UniProtKB/Swiss-Prot annotation:
GO MF annotations in UniProt: ATP binding; ATP phosphoribosyltransferase activity; magnesium ion binding
Similarity annotation: Belongs to the ATP phosphoribosyltransferase family. Long subfamily.
Keywords: Amino-acid biosynthesis, ATP-binding, Cytoplasm, Glycosyltransferase, Histidine biosynthesis, Magnesium, Metal-binding, Nucleotide-binding, Transferase
Taxonomic placement: Bacteria, Pseudomonadati, Pseudomonadota, Gammaproteobacteria, Alteromonadales
GO biological process, one term: L-histidine biosynthetic process
Pathway where this protein functions: Amino-acid biosynthesis; L-histidine biosynthesis; L-histidine from 5-phospho-alpha-D-ribose 1-diphosphate: step 1/9
Name of this protein: ATP phosphoribosyltransferase
PROSITE patterns named in the record: ATP_P_PHORIBOSYLTR
Cofactor(s) required for function per UniProt: Mg(2+)
Length: 299
C-alpha cells in the first residue's frame, strides 16, 4: 500500500479508553509500539497508522475523512454529532459495532441535601456539565428550563464551588459522586466504546483491510464473551447435562477409551458457567469439569 492508502485509525491519546483500544488492536494482530512523545504510531506488520488524539477530536476526524476508523465512546460521538449538525458541518459516520469496554452512563446528580422528586425538581436551576448537547436534548424532551454551566473537567466539584445547583456527568461506579457529596438522580444516556468508519468511499485494498480488522475484532469480542467447557458425562444423563450448559450450541460428544458408559463433552458457551450449574452437573454424574477462557474465535 502507498502512504495515501494506509489505514488510519484514531484512538484516545490518554484516558479511560486508551489502553483498552491499544489492547484490542494488539489482540487483532496489529503490532505497534507507542512512543508517548509522538502522536502517530506505525504498525510493524500491517499498513496501519494509529493517531493518538483527544477523544473529542476523534468523531470530527472520522466525519471529515481525515482518518478512516475511530474508537470512541458513544457519549462523545453523540455529543459531537449534535454539535456539528447545529453548525451545518458533516456529522455522518458508520458505527461498525459496539465494543466490550468503556461502559458508563451520563447522569444527573445533585447534592445530598437536595430534595429531588423528579426531573422537574431541576426547573430553573443551573447544571454543570461537559456534555451540553446531550443535556439540552434530554431537558427539552422533559420540558424543563434550566441554565447550563459548561466545564471541561472536574464537573463534580461545581456545586461545592457554588458554580451550579447540580451536575450532568459520566458515572461508572458512583464513587466520585459520593466523595463529593452528590447522589445520582437520573440516567440520561448509556454509553459503550464503539468503532466508527468514515462514510467516504475507500479503495478496494483499504476496504478489504477494514473488513479484516472488523472480522478480527468480532472474533476477539466473541472470545471474551465465551468459555470453552470440557467434561466427562454418563451416557444415561447426557441430555440433561447438555441442557444445563448455558448458551451452548451443538456440543461435541466423543467416546472415552475403554468406557462405553461415559463420553467426553466439548462445548463453547456464550454465558458464564456459575458454581451452582457446575454443582448440578456434578450431581448428574459429570466429572473432570474444565471451564477455560478463549483467546480468539473465528467462523
Amino acid at each position: 500500500m502507498s502512504e495515501s492508502t494506509r489505514l488510519r485509525i484514531a484512538i484516545q491519546k490518554s484516558g479511560r479508553l486508551s489502553k483498552e483500544s491499544q489492547k484490542l488492536l494488539k489482540s487483532c494482530g496489529v503490532k505497534f509500539n507507542v512512543n508517548e512523545q509522538r502522536l502517530i504510531a506505525h504498525s510493524d506488520n500491517m499498513p496501519i497508522d494509529l493517531l493518538r488524539v483527544r477523544d473529542d477530536d476523534i468523531p470530527g476526524l472520522v466525519m471529515d475523512g481525515v482518518v478512516d476508523l475511530g474508537i470512541i465512546g458513544e457519549n462523545v460521538l453523540e455529543e459531537e454529532q449534535i454539535e456539528r449538525q447545529s453548525l451545518g458541518k458533516p456529522a455522518e459516520c458508520v458505527k461498525l459495532r459496539e465494543l466490550d469496554f468503556g461502559a458508563c452512563r451520563l447522569s444527573l446528580a445533585v447534592p445530598n441535601e437536595f430534595e429531588y422528586q423528579d426531573a422537574s425538581s431541576l426547573e430553573g436551576l443551573r447544571i454543570a456539565t461537559s456534555y451540553p448537547n446531550l443535556l439540552r436534548r434530554y431537558m427539552q424532551e422533559q420540558g424543563i428550563n434550566y441554565r447550563d454551566c459548561m466545564l471541561k473537567g472536574s464537573v463534580e466539584v461545581a456545586p461545592r464551588a457554588g458554580l451550579s445547583d447540580g451536575i450532568c456527568d459520566l458515572v461508572s461506579t458512583g464513587a466520585t459522586l459520593e466523595a463529593n457529596g452528590l447522589y445520582e438522580t437520573e440516567v440520561i444516556y448509556r454509553s459503550m466504546a464503539c468503532i466508527i468508519q468514515s462514510t467516504q468511499s475507500q479503495p478496494d485494498d483499504k476496504q478489504a483491510l477494514i473488513n479484516k480488522i472488523l472480522s478480527r475484532i468480532n472474533g476477539v469480542v466473541r472470545a471474551k464473551e465465551s468459555k470453552y467447557i470440557l467434561l466427562h458425562a454418563p451416557t444415561e444423563t447426557l441430555e440433561q447435562i447438555v441442557a444445563l450448559l448455558p448458551g451452548a450450541e451443538n456440543p461435541t460428544v466423543l467416546p472415552l477409551n475403554d468406557d462405553t458408559n461415559r463420553v467426553a463433552i466439548h462445548a463453547v458457551s456464550t454465558e458464564d458457567l456459575f458454581w451452582d450449574t457446575m454443582e448440578q452437573l456434578t450431581q448428574l454424574g459429570a466429572s473432570s469439569i474444565l471451564v477455560m477462557p478463549i483467546e480468539k474465535m473465528m467462523g
